[in-house]
Curated annotation (Swiss-Prot):
It comes from Aeromonas hydrophila subsp. hydrophila (strain ATCC 7966 / DSM 30187 / BCRC 13018 / CCUG 14551 / JCM 1027 / KCTC 2358 / NCIMB 9240 / NCTC 8049). GO terms for cellular component: cytosol. This is Glycogen synthase. It holds the Pfam family Glycos_transf_1. Its EC number is 2.4.1.21. ADP-alpha-D-glucose binds at K20.
Length: 486
């Protein structure tokens, strides 16, 4: 069903192509792009960080002062504009908050004024929208960084004719990060005082994600299964009761996959391309992966893993059993950086098994693509995974994902045993090292004993698609439901 074009203000802390630390940035680029292709007037708003790419393309529009509180200083800022693949991007320039080497932290230490910084983003986004005469139908917020926006629409701007018809939605990309800060950081948002008890984390602290969830008109998680998990104590990171209060307004919408960048038939990073009808290029990619990572070029199954080295990604589940698995005739390639202690353990194992394990302690786009193409299996033993993108890439590249059945992983991977006809990979449930090892051994057994079925599952995987236009249709419905609220 076609809907009338909407004006959408999409506020995010990062956008792929300009500045990125994680998966939020991928969505913040793709979703506005595909919404615009449907005819909606989408404007992205984000901070003008020091690290923004293509800074010289930004055009200064206006300089303004953000009102704060009687007796307290207003905050000066400037609004810049640039284009991102045909979508208008507004950059909020306030050097005292955003002229820093990184986005959120330096040397693994969060900036102590992050609450104040992103309170400014929320207040300035609405102020700037009014200064630019862009009256949005929908303000689309993303994660804790924008959690104050829905509250400000219902307080500061409740009787502002400019926002009379504006409704807000918030997307939950990762509820583990909630934006909890001391109350005094929000001096520029006096409205918090009347709502502090409701949006507090504990005495004297404010929870920005909680604020967004309580006051947005509609809420979505980035996969249906993750939306269900947010209603449980195991999956909501202490916010189950808050999500339960808003259960009627919560839905799960699976992220799409950007097949323009992740398609083995047109991947410029690969030494050879391939598709579902001709996998010869995948074999060349496998040999290239072995050569580049220093592994012997032999005919063994390769298990790949590309991730941040964190507990969330399940690296601590893999480490206790990796040496046992490496005694099988396999090779493992792990690419990523993060926790130094996890990296040190992987480095030690790589030295013990130089012909079986390659560990590359950095992230590199080209190598990430080569792992997806050259491996036979892709490991994602995540403790939680709101949506996940690498399993989608793996499916497209015919590299069977081996995942823990949580969040979006459960929505996107069909287990070999659970449904042999529709299978696209391997799933396991319990977050223990031995259960993970069992799943890895099961995948190895099937690879060796049933190559015909392996080829069928590989074809199933490569024919699976998670297209953004399908997701956009669901977002459009959520916007309509939000606008229907009075």
């Amino acid at each position: 069903m076609a809907i009338n074009p909407l004006k959408i203000l999409f506020v995010a802390s990062e956008v792929e192509g300009l500045v990125k630390t994680g998966g939020l940035a991928d969505v913040a680029r793709a979703l506005p792009l595909y919404l615009a292709q449907k005819g909606h007037d989408v404007r992205i708003m984000l901070p003008f960080y020091k690290t923004i790419k293509r800074r010289d393309e930004a055009k200064l529009l206006v300089s303004r002062w953000l009102p704060t509180h009687p007796g307290l200083p207003d905050i000066g800022y400037r609004i810049y504009q640039m284009d991102l693949e045909g979508v208008c991007v507004y950059l909020l320039d306030c050097p005292q908050y955003f002229d820093r080497p990184q986005l959120y932290a330096e040397n693994n230490q969060a900036y102590p004024d992050n609450g104040e910084r992103f309170a400014f983003l929320a207040a300035a986004a609405l102020h700037a929208s009014e200064q630019l005469a862009f009256a949005p139908d929908i303000v689309h917020c993303n994660d804790w960084h924008t959690g104050l926006l829905p509250l400000l629409l219902k307080t500061r701007h409740a009787h502002n004719p400019f926002f009379q018809h504006t409704r807000s939605v918030i997307s939950i990309h990762n509820a583990a990060f909630q934006g909890v800060f001391e109350r005094q950081q929000f001096w520029a948002v006096p409205e918090i005082a009347d709502y502090e008890q409701r949006i507090s984390y504990d005495y004297g602290h404010v929870n920005l994600l909680k604020c967004g969830v309580l006051y947005a008109d509609k809420i979505n998680a980035v996969s249906p299964n993750y939306a269900s998990e947010l209603l449980t104590h195991l999956g909501a990171h202490g916010m189950a009761s808050i999500f339960q209060q808003r259960a009627a307004d919560l839905r799960g919408i699976l992220n799409g996959c950007d097949y323009q960048d992740w398609d083995p038939a047109f991947d410029d990073f690969l030494p050879a391309t391939y598709d579902v009808d001709n996998l010869a290029g995948k074999h060349i990619c496998k040999q290239s992966l072995q050569q580049e990572t220093g592994l012997p070029v032999v005919d063994l199954p390769i298990y790949g893993m590309v991730c941040r080295l964190t507990e969330q990604k399940g690296v601590h589940l893999l480490l206790p059993v990796l040496d046992k698995f490496l005694h099988h005739k396999v090779q493992v390639v792990i690419v990523g950086s993060g926790d130094p202690s996890l990296a040190a353990q992987l480095q030690t194992l790589a030295q013990q098994f130089p012909d079986r394990l390659a560990f590359i302690n950095t992230y590199d786009d080209r190598l990430a693509h080569l792992v997806e193409a050259g491996a036979d299996f892709f490991l994602m033993p995540s403790l939680f995974e709101p949506c996940g993108l690498n399993q989608m890439y793996s499916l497209a590249y015919g590299t069977l994902p081996l995942v823990r059945a949580v969040g979006g992983l459960k929505d996107t991977v069909v287990d070999w045993d659970a449904d042999p006809e529709q299978a696209t990979g391997f799933c396991f449930n319990d977050p223990t090292a031995n259960i993970l090892l069992d799943a890895m051994r099961r995948s190895l057994l099937y690879y060796l004993q049933d190559p015909e079925q392996f080829a069928r599952v590989q074809r199933n995987a490569m024919n699976t698609r998670f297209n953004w236009p399908d997701s956009v249709t669901q977002y459009e419905q959520m916007y309509q439901d939000a606008l229907a609220r009075h």
